[in-house]
Amino acid sequence: MGAAESINTVNIVTKAYAKIMTTMVTDQDITADQSQVFSIDHVKGDVVIKGDVFTQMLVINLASLMKAIATQSAQDQLIDNIAQQAQAAVSGLNLAQYAYVSNNIDRLITACVQMSTDMRVSCKSKVTMTQSFSVTDVEGDVRVTGVKFNQFANILSSCAMDASVNNDQARDIVSQIKQRGDAKASGLDPTTLIVIIVLVMVGAPMGAGFMAGRRAIGPLLASVGLIGGGAVALGYVPRPVKIEGFSSDPDFTLAQPAATVKGLTFTAAVAKLKSTDGYGALFWKNYDVKGTTAVKLQETLSYFAPAGYDPASWAGVGDSAPPFRIFPGLYQGKGDPGARPRAAYGYAGPVAGPKKGDAYLDGDTGSYYVLGDSWKMRGTISGHQNGRTDYWGTVDPTTTAALTGSERYIWVDPFTLVKSTVWLFTGSPKKWTQQQTAPLDIPLTNTPSDFNVWVYKDDTAVQAVKWSSVGAGVAGAALTASALLMPDSVASSEMSPAVGTGTPAIGTGSPAVGTGFPAHRG
């Protein structure tokens, strides 16, 4: 129920966010002043003005209207809504998830605050166009022929891009909270609790009547053991999924995965773990981590441990809070970066385009840029030659045919930025030859919310029911065997002589006591 509740509250967060974005007051002020003035005075002769063209094109990207939050009250309302729904989202998960969800809620609020701050700036543009002719006191003909005045004004504020970048961050965090809600860690399932309670309620009366009804109690205990064991064997005792958070890669030399699946989302991987009895744990890998740097994989990897997995070899030894930072996405093209530049080699660019922190290489100049509030140049690849296009990527140029049409390629090592190298495709026959190192000034981005996760099935309830069933079964078998091998009638007959022998002894003492009475009287 916690999973469903957390999903619902996350949906409410999204709706509240969409509502405040829809109802916010926009402050877009675009002014275009146009004027064309002809002033001709005191001219003795003909005045001919021919072919005058006055053209103006004003293009306004309406997405910039979503840039502005004009009032502080709108910002406050946004943050209040997010904070309220964040509390509801956290309450929908148990304490095992509290730290993770709290961190993501904090990231969500931070992203929203950043977005509202960026969008607070009004998108104001002003275009003034003037064309003026002033002819004064000219004696003779005045001919103005083929005059053209063309101006193209493209009003596209970078704030729209800022808003979309932050919106992607908020949407990713909401998605992660929802996924974690789907795979919510929980304690004992109510069904398991019922089974344990029944065992206790049945076992207590049986213990009290141990000597009184072996024939009835023994089979009943044995039946309880069989039922509990059957429930465990048939999978009726739930095995809730628990999330341990970030973990280093499992040691596959000690434990081979039962299956490895590519491209699964976290939700789909957890669902597969739940539905497959032969799987005991899951390592969901979304980043390749080396040292303090992580690079996002083009496809996720889901490693499923067998049911009898060894936690010591599968859980890894990574810290609960990842210390690494993420290498940004790489893009490339010719000229200044546009809204949707092409992804670099070895990097699958998202449909939404570059995110804040991603880098772009201008192949015509060798200059590279990093996206912050806007694209800013960070440096130029050394050795660039005019007329030769530069390309870059994270793949070895000698292992792919995709670069055969290139001549100069910068191989970027995402784990060691200072070791990026330039390769030339030259020679006869042509082959890739390493030239020189190419240090890059590209900052790493923050730790992601969709990092590698370790998930396992909790066998606590299964073990409790299993051993309770074993105990009940053994006790029931022992009682049943004793009832069959030593019935009540045999036991009574064996015990009766000892009781009878004691009776005369008690009676023998009576005369002695009685003899004393007459003597006392005499």
Swiss-Prot record:
InterPro entries: Virion_mem_poxvirus_L1. The chain crosses the membrane at residues 193-213, 217-237. Its main location: host cell. The keyword Cytoplasm does not apply. It is found in: Host membrane. It comes from the Viruses. Keywords: Host membrane, Lipoprotein, Membrane, Myristate, Transmembrane, Transmembrane helix. It is a multi-pass membrane protein. Residues 503-522 are annotated as: Disordered. GO terms for cellular component: host cell membrane; membrane. A lipid is attached at G2 (N-myristoyl glycine). May play a critical role in virion formation. Essential for virus replication in vitro. This is Putative myristoylated protein 053R. It comes from Frog virus 3 (isolate Goorha).
